[in-house]
C-alpha cells in the first residue's frame, strides 16, 4: 500500500486534473515543473502541488494523519485576475472534496490559507493556497 504522503499527492493530483475549468483552460498541473532552456520559454499559467507536512493522529485502533499541503499557482498575466481565477478552480476542486485512494479514507479537506503576490522577478504572479486534510488508513 502507498504511504500517506503518496496517497495524498495522488488524490489531489487526480482531483485537479479532472476539474473542467482547469481542463478547458489547458492549465497543466505539476509535481515538478519541466525546466525550459530559458525563463522566456516557460509556458504560463500552471499549477504546482508543493510542500506538505504530516502529523500522526494515531489512536489505539486507527492510523490517521493530519496533512497540510500547499498548492502554487504561477501566472504571467499582467494583473491579479488570472491567478485568483485559477485559485478559485483549485478551491472548487478541493474544498470538502470526496477524495479517494486505495487503502485510505479521506475524512475531510479544507482550505486554511490563501494569498497571491508579485514574485521577486517583477513579472510573475504567485498564488499560494494551503489545504489541511485528515486521512485514515483502512
Where are the regions that the model predicts?
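Acidic-leaning, charged glycine-interspersed low-complexity segments
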Residues: 22-24, 37, 92-138
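Short, cysteine-centered beta-strand-loop-beta hairpins and adjacent loop/turn segments enriched
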Residues: 56-59, 77-81, 135-138
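Small/polar-rich, solvent-exposed N-terminal microdomains that initiate assembly or binding
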Residues: 1-61, 97-102
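Mid-chain, well-packed structural core segment of small domains
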Residues: 74-93
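Oligomerization/assembly interface segments of phage tail-like spikes and tubes
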Residues: 63-77, 125-135
Amino acid at each position: 500500500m502507498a504511504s500517506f504522503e503518496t496517497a495524498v499527492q495522488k488524490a489531489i493530483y487526480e482531483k485537479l486534473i479532472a476539474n473542467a475549468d482547469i481542463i478547458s483552460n489547458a492549465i497543466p498541473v505539476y509535481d515538478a515543473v519541466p525546466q525550459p532552456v530559458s525563463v522566456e520559454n516557460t509556458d504560463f499559467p500552471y499549477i504546482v502541488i508543493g510542500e506538505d507536512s504530516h502529523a500522526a493522529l494515531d489512536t489505539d485502533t486507527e492510523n490517521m494523519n493530519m496533512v497540510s499541503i500547499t498548492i502554487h499557482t504561477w501566472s504571467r498575466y499582467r494583473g491579479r485576475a488570472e491567478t485568483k481565477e485559477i485559485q478559485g478552480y483549485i478551491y472548487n476542486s478541493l474544498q470538502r472534496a470526496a477524495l479517494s485512494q486505495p487503502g485510505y479514507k479521506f475524512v475531510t479537506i479544507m482550505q486554511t490559507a490563501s494569498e497571491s503576490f508579485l514574485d521577486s522577478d517583477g513579472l510573475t504572479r504567485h498564488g499560494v493556497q494551503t489545504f489541511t486534510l485528515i486521512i485514515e488508513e483502512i
